[in-house]
Amino acid sequence: MACRRRLLPCAGLGLFGVLCWVWVSFASFPDDQLPLEVFDTVDRGAFLPQSAFREMEFASIASYKGPGNTDGRSNKQLPILLWWSAGLFPHFPGDTERIDCALSSCLVTSNRKVQLYKRTASIIFYGTDFRAYEAPLPRLPHQTWALFHEESPMNNYFLSHAPGIRLFNYTATFRRESDYPLTLQWLPSLDYLLRPVAVSLEEKNRLRREGMAPVLYMQSHCDVPSDRDRYVQELMKYIQVDSYGKCLKNKPLPEHLEDTATATGEEPGFMNFVARYKFHLAFENGLCPDYMTEKLWRPLHQGCVPVYRGSPAVADWMPNGHAAIIIDNFPSPKALADFLRHLDENDDEYTRYLEFKNLKSITNTRLLEALETREWGVNDMSKPNYLNGFECYVCDQENARLAAERAHRKDPERNPPPLPKMASNSHMGCPLPSPGYGQVQDLPADDGWLQIWPQDYWQSLDQAEGLESLIRHNESDPSLLWRHIQSITERRARGKH
């Protein structure tokens, strides 16, 4: 299934990718029309697998090529892209398709039997599912690795360490520095921000006089790396907070909203309920530059003020300089509470935080340009979803690389080899988790957060170094990872690492 829980923005778009400027076309081809000998042999440096293509369904349909795509090759001549993660293949039906992208064409498949084929040019991984001890080894010199990771850094801290991220040649992550940035994945459009406020300030003030808290906290995912509950618990000492969900719950939700409380969608009844609050505590579960989710964009959409902690660079993407309240700008929870009370009691100053609802008040050109120029769309039938967009990016990059390699082999003096491409830590690298409030050295040894997240972060570094060692030694058995980690640890203890 292409769209997982956190891949909601791509839901329903697979059939419409043909309409976008990258002109993605999905084709299936009957396998019995393609004899085995048309496929390149495998890399015999490892082993000879059975033909994966005998089990693949193909059927010829019209191709929708982009204006820059002059690729006239038949399917038997195209490079292959292998989607490695089980259950994530952004096409249907079957497990193999042809894609015709902006500049070139490829075959894409989820059938792992093609892993060692020479025509398999790149393997695409879903970051949440990537495990060092399950990596496709040996890593072949003719293949690149591509990473798709739009989810929280907490899902896989392997990717936040340099030895891990630099194993990949192409990236699509929430970081703006990645090759195919997904930074605004939870912001469907500019119109989403401009939607009129759902509940008027007059109504919010009336509810406040009746005893409703000014601040909403809605969370059922507790014990996360950002340690948000620890901060909120301290904040509650200084200002009234209505907390729903499993974490720090002090008020019950109406029964009819219980099933939608943790949804990332926008069920009208739930949205109208939370829109009554002036301020929403918007804490990401992991802290990393450019990691921003619906927790930030949803209150802006509703006309509430997000009180935000997540991306330290969030101000770079706000509509203007006063659309969100950044928690890290305050020295303490008490100082933040004092400021929120001040806004609660001063309508004119509170209203300044909603001025972005007028298009003329959106002054952030970075935000406007990013929304205007991104190649993928969210619920936009004129653009591909970001899964299909990224695979087309990889397809075009790989065809360019392969063409440059052929030219170099033909005339090395006139055609230099293509430059090696490797992801850097800026494509993902997220910091060591820190306590939501206070200093790590002040936490008791049996603190639950302390026992989980710092350890998980550093164990992920061990695995990144271990996999890098496996690849460097041309190992074919990923289960040897633990032996390599032990060897690295011993060398480090002797001061030789």
UniProtKB/Swiss-Prot annotation:
Chief location of this protein within or outside the cell: endoplasmic reticulum
Gene field: fut11
Subcellular location(s) per record: Endoplasmic reticulum membrane
GO CC annotations, alphabetized: endoplasmic reticulum; endoplasmic reticulum membrane; Golgi membrane
Protein name according to UniProt: GDP-fucose protein O-fucosyltransferase 4
Topological domain spans for side Cytoplasmic: 1-6
Record keywords: Disulfide bond, Endoplasmic reticulum, Glycoprotein, Glycosyltransferase, Membrane, Signal-anchor, Transferase, Transmembrane, Transmembrane helix
Purpose: Protein O-fucosyltransferase that specifically catalyzes O-fucosylation of serine or threonine residues in EMI domains of target proteins. Attaches fucose through an O-glycosidic linkage. O-fucosylation of EMI domain-containing proteins may be required for facilitating protein folding and secretion.
Keyword match Transmembrane helix: yes
Catalytic activity entry: L-threonyl-[protein] + GDP-beta-L-fucose = 3-O-(alpha-L-fucosyl)-L-threonyl-[protein] + GDP + H(+); L-seryl-[protein] + GDP-beta-L-fucose = 3-O-(alpha-L-fucosyl)-L-seryl-[protein] + GDP + H(+)
InterPro entries assigned to the protein according to its UniProt record, in alphabetical order: Alpha-1_3-FUT_met, Glyco_tran_10_C, Glyco_tran_10_N, Glyco_trans_10, GT10-like_C_sf
Protein family according to the UniProt entry: Belongs to the glycosyltransferase 10 family.
Entry membrane topology: Single-pass type II membrane protein
Phylogenetic lineage: Eukaryota, Metazoa, Chordata, Craniata, Vertebrata
Domain of life, source organism: Eukaryota
Intrachain disulfide bonds: 392-395
